[in-house]
């Protein structure tokens, strides 16, 4: 499996996470529809920004999730959101309850 963490800060980050929270079903359909999708988590950070974590079966899936996320942010966030800092790589462990 492959994971990507997208971390948002600065202009537009707070609005972005407000929208993610309010439009949860839309995000679930958008990112959950990526081929090879495994899981998605979004969380706010203490500094007013936040991060998302997407896990897919392979890098092709995480690349597609990033493309979809960027398009969604561009179309739905009125403030100019800074591009996210990203960290990605192959997973060494993944589990859930």
Show the residue positions of the predicted features.
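Short S/T/G/P-rich N-terminal loop/turn motif that feeds into the first structured element of a domain
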Residues: 1-51, 57-71, 77-97
